Regions:
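Canonical helix-turn-helix DNA-binding module
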Residues: 33-64, 68, 72
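N-terminal helix-turn-helix DNA-binding core of bacterial DNA-binding proteins
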Residues: 8-42
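Basic, amphipathic "hinge/linker" alpha-helix immediately C-terminal to the N-terminal HTH DNA-binding motif
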Residues: 66-85
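Short, Lys/Arg-enriched N-terminal segment that forms or immediately precedes the first helix
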Residues: 1-9
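C-terminal regulatory/oligomerization modules of transcriptional regulators
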Residues: 107-145
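A generic alpha-helix surface/boundary motif
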Residues: 85-87, 103-104
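Residues within the alpha-helical elements of helix-turn-helix
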Residues: 39, 77, 94
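Helix N-cap / loop-to-helix initiation motif
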Residues: 43, 96-100
Length: 145
């Protein structure tokens, strides 16, 4: 089920951090400030400030020099963000969009798309998966542009 876009009180930056942290935990087993900074291409000082803020908001637990872990609320939110990201990525791949364009478009859309639109895309992806011929027809129209 698609997740909600970032509410007014939560910045897209917080969502980017959560997504990065969960990805690191899933791939490396842990997330450190240095790894988050490298993944997001920002300074460690900026990451430390945001991590402390997210700790205060109850999204993660941070201990200086020891790393961090997501709280249940933080992990749930991060998983929803990743599912939203994956749904959009899968949809654009079905349409034959290049990986570079997909990355750019998904990063631009994922925090701002409404739950209603996500549900519609999810339904469309399901229908397209059941009708590969339709995907071929769509690709023939989009690759000519």
């Amino acid at each position: 089920m698609p997740s909600k876009p970032a509410p007014a009180g939560r910045s897209t930056a917080v969502e980017d951090y959560l997504e990065q942290i969960l990805d690191l935990i899933n791939t490396k087993g842990y997330a450190r400030v240095a790894d988050i900074a490298q993944g997001l291409k920002i300074s460690q000082a900026s990451v430390t400030n945001m991590v402390q803020r997210m700790d205060a908001e109850g999204l993660l637990k941070y201990e200086k020099y020891r790393g961090l872990v997501l709280t249940t609320a933080g992990e749930t939110l991060a998983r929803n963000i990743m599912q939203r990201h994956q749904l959009l990525t899968d949809f654009f791949r079905m349409l034959g969009i290049s990986e570079e364009v997909i990355y750019h478009d998904v990063e631009g859309m994922e925090h701002h798309i409404s739950p209603q639109t996500l549900r519609a895309i999810e339904a469309l992806v399901s229908e397209l998966q059941q009708n590969p011929r339709l995907i071929t027809n769509i690709k023939s129209h989009t690759h000519g542009s």
